Amino acid sequence: MDAIVIAGGIPRPEDPLYTYSHGDSKALVDVAGKPMIQWVLDALGGAKQVDNVIVIGLSPKSGLTCKKPMHYVSNQGRMLANIVAGVNKSLEFNKKNKYVLIVSSDIPTLKSEMVDWLVDTCMGTKDDLYYGVCPKDVMEARFPGSKRTYTHLKDMDVCGADVNLTHVRMATEHLDMWESLIGSRKSPLKQASIIGFGTLFALFMRRLTLEDAVRRVSDRIGIRGRAIVWPYAEPCMDVDKPHQLELVREDLARQQNELAGKTKRAVKRPVKKTTKAKHIAKAVKKTTTRAKKDVALVAKTKLKAEK
């Protein structure tokens, strides 16, 4: 499966992260010694379920690397247009592709095994769109103080994931609907006019479970949707504010230090011989000793014969 990484966002002066990006792409902001997006590419590169990685909004000049084949597509100016361009690029590689991963470039704590978990979990059914959510307790346990924004449901409080999976036809159907939803994602009232005020009111009153919400929105839009409840917080830990940037910087720096410490201890630790190795060494020693005795005996016998 191909992964489309959205990396075209450039913070404006009024954006909280502008002082960190200095007018460059948000994806290139430094996190523990790497561009933020490089951590995401490392995770995708190590995922068994990823074939190609398509980066939207950057160029080869960015100096990024990935263990999987990586391709660049220029920024199309709008979120939906970027996704459509990424899907079209994926179909260039293989017209039979049915699903793609849509990945944000600002989730640097993502790991390879989490990407594989998502693909394996989603492919148990054949839906149009798989949208991930993380329960509040999972997020707060992993990243206390992250100050995420949660949607309050009847059965749980959740925040949205930034790694999702969609059928490629979603890039060719319902485009007007998607454009409206994405364009109004900061305005609940505008979204309400699209998904229905009844659904929004039920959400506000906490009358909907996660399953109810998915069913209502799917019916309204006319797709088969499925919510994926993440057991991991990392795919939902996107960086939008300075305190979140500092949080992931500290987290990844700590992980690097722990890994370096383990590697250092492993190098210093003497290699213990296994029981089998000990037996072999003992047998070799006996054989060598016996051989030395045999040589000495032959020499002694030869000396007597000469006398």
What are these regions (language model features)?
Residues 111-218, 230-234:
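Conserved core of the sugar-phosphate nucleotidyltransferase
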